From Swiss-Prot:
InterPro entries attached to this UniProt entry: NADH_Q_OxRdtase_suD, NADH_UbQ_OxRdtase_49kDa_CS, NDH1_su_D/H, NiFe-Hase_large
Name the record gives this protein: NAD(P)H-quinone oxidoreductase subunit H, chloroplastic
Signal peptide, first to last residue: none
Gene: ndhH
PANTHER family: NADH DEHYDROGENASE [UBIQUINONE] IRON-SULFUR PROTEIN 2, MITOCHONDRIAL, NADH-UBIQUINONE OXIDOREDUCTASE 49 KDA SUBUNIT
Organism, as annotated: Crucihimalaya wallichii
Length: 393
């Protein structure tokens, strides 16, 4: 980093990698003129673990536990992208019941990720109370995850061709109860935060990104939608069963930190709508033991239909990836999570390139903080929403 040659006495400050507001091991070298930011240089790589190279020496089923360590707050999405690639390479069909359960898990994971963004973001700008509120709702989601997958985090639930296990007894009723409860809590967040004049002073007009600028920087997710671009891969690519549900893309025009907050808050409400529709329309209904009903062929043969299964086949460790390449992507809470996959007719991928949304979105940070105040760095960085596990990989 070159020190600007001026007549002013500039100060260079290291923020991180151990600063509590860095959201992981991010280091910023900030050049200050008093309280004004002259330059900012992010230093990455403190959490690099070679995830792409590890993939080249593992079968997909062996690699699944690794991918949950990218974005460890939204692990369902990393699992989804890991199985979606081989499914498309092998033209593997997923039963509709399994696809619906995947959608439910993905949207619950999206809400949990947005909640754990909201609490620390508010703490960064000086509001401690919401930090404790969000853990209350997040615990309910983790209880649902634990009942369905056995793990509160790092679920290892998705499989090539479906999911690892069907939903347990009573899970659907618990999830519907959570949906009704959570909608009232979102209203509470709006009353507590959105109309707070101190909060508005800190975020309104801070870190503005225009629509064209957002596209040029390759931004995605709430960062892009808050800049007036209603782009959501769930609508564009229509993967899983998202095209069967009624929901709207949430977006704002202002492009500032407040707009990014509003997009994420309203996205949680839309996720609840999707979950409720998926639960009510789940193929096979809420009956838990579909496998035992499958044996009753004489009484009701429809339960043997492909769509009612939760998984087609348990994948073999020797599952071969055909000799071709493709790019597959999902709409993760932080943006477009993609994988460029090259198979070579073996059990291991020849190339596994990860496109993490946090890494791309973080690149615009130096442009946003220039000519801003030192305290605004925390607001802008918090509004981007990064997890260093996926930034460094």
């Amino acid at each position: 980093m070159k020190r600007p040659v001026t007549g002013k006495d500039l100060m260079i400050v290291n923020m991180g990698p151990h600063h509590p507001s860095m959201h992981g091991v991010l280091r910023l070298i900030v050049t200050l003129d008093g309280e004004d930011v002259v330059d900012c240089e992010p230093i990455l790589g403190y959490l690099h673990r070679g995830m792409e190279k590890i993939a080249e020496n593992r079968a997909i089923i062996q690699y699944l536990p690794y991918v949950t360590r990218w974005d460890y707050l939204a692990t369902m999405f990393t699992e989804a992208i890991t199985v979606n690639g081989p499914e498309q390479l092998g033209n593997i069909q997923v039963p509709k019941r399994a696809s619906y359960i995947r959608v439910i898990m993905l949207e619950l994971s999206r809400i949990a990720s947005h909640l754990l963004w909201l609490g620390p973001f508010m703490a960064d700008i000086g509001a401690q109370t919401p930090f404790f509120y969000i853990f209350r709702e997040r615990e309910f989601i983790y209880d649902l995850f634990e009942a369905a997958t056995g793990m509160r985090m790092m679920h290892n639930f998705f499989r090539i061709g479906g999911i690892a296990a069907d939903l347990p007894y009573g899970w659907i009723d618990k999830c519907l109860d959570f949906c009704d409860y959570f909608l009232t809590e979102v209203v509470e967040y709006q009353k507590l935060i959105t109309r707070n004049p101190i909060f508005l002073e800190r975020v309104e007009g801070v870190g503005i990104i225009g629509g064209e600028e957002a596209i040029n920087w390759g931004l995605s997710g709430p960062m892009l939608r808050a800049s007036g671009i209603p782009w959501d891969l769930r609508k564009v690519d229509r993967y899983e069963s998202y095209d069967e549900f009624e929901w709207e893309i949430q977006w704002q025009k202002q492009g500032d930190s407040l707009a990014r907050y509003l997009v994420r808050l309203s996205e949680m409400t839309e996720s609840i709508k999707i979950i409720q529709q998926a639960l009510e329309g789940l193929p096979g209904g809420p009956y838990e033991n579909l496998e035992s009903r499958g044996f009753e062929r004489k009484r009701n043969p429809e339960w043997n239909d492909f769509e009612y299964r939760f998984i087609s086949k348990k994948p073999s460790p020797t599952f071969e990836l055909s000799k071709q390449e493709l790019y597959v992507r999902v709409e993760a809470p932080k943006g477009e999570l993609g994988i460029f996959l090259i198979g070579d007719q073996s059990g291991f991928p020849w190339r596994w390139k990860i496109r993490p949304p946090g890494f791309i979105n973080l690149q615009i940070l130096p442009e946003l903080v220039k000519r801003m105040k030192l305290a605004d760095i925390m607001t802008i960085l918090g509004s981007i929403d990064i997890i260093m596990g996926e930034v460094d990989r």
